[in-house]
């Protein structure tokens, strides 16, 4: 999704994850109409989201953050070995090499490393769709590149990735298809190879671009 700031693109995320109600239209997933009554139902389908605030706990380590709310237990006791093994397997599968130890406290991580942990948590549960809400906001150049490389690896691993961003450079670096929103409504969805940055700007600011056939 590409949009101007403040056009309620995060609200679209809320609808996609059923955190917000759907008042009209249909929810189609894998070609079928589905009725979802909340975020847990969306999660059960394999839809995961990384919100802009990341929802990480600074006082917990990487492993406990990745399993927060969905801890593995054995005889009502946390199964630390299983969680650590799964966390390491997930990070290795994404070729994450930027954290020294998965037992590091999140408070010691950089912005890019925090984003990496949040994204890794989203793919830990056999997810099919990962929604990233402005994952590079407030990151430096090197950290942004780190996160975008991770987004590419998600796609290479067969996951559908919905990237919500106001940064055209980021969008054009990783996207296959671009959906432009104007005043909270879909202006157009076009293959990246068939549209230029200036045309995207026209779509998100005016809702139309004659050069791509949207009037």
Regions found by a protein language model. Name each.
Residues 145-157:
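Helical segment within the ABC ATPase nucleotide-binding domain
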Residues 177, 189:
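Short, glycine/charged-rich "phosphate-handling" switch motifs in NTP-dependent
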Residues 165-166:
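H-loop/switch region of ABC-family ATPase nucleotide-binding domains
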């Amino acid at each position: 999704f590409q949009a101007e700031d403040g056009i309620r693109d995060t609200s679209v995320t809320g609808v996609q994850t059923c955190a917000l109600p759907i008042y009209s239209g249909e929810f189609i997933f894998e070609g079928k109409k589905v009725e979802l009554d909340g975020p847990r139902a969306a999660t059960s389908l394999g839809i995961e989201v990384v919100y802009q605030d990341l929802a990480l706990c600074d006082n917990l380590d990487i492993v406990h953050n990745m399993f927060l709310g969905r801890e593995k237990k054995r005889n009502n006791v946390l199964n630390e070995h299983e969680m650590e093994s799964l966390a390491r397997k997930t990070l290795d599968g994404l070729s994450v090499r930027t954290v020294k130890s998965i037992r590091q406290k999140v408070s010691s991580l950089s912005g890019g490393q925090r984003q990496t942990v949040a994204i890794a948590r989203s793919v830990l549960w056999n997810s099919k769709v990962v929604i990233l809400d402005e994952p590079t906001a407030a990151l430096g150049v090197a950290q942004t590149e780190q996160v975008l490389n991770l987004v590419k690896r998600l796609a290479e691993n067969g996951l559908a990735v919905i990237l919500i961003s106001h940064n055209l450079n980021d969008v054009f670096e990783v996207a296959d298809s671009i959906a432009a929103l104007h005043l909270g409504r879909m202006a157009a969805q076009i293959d990246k190879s068939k549209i230029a940055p200036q045309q995207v700007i026209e779509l998100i600011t005016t809702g139309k671009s004659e050069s791509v056939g949207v009037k």
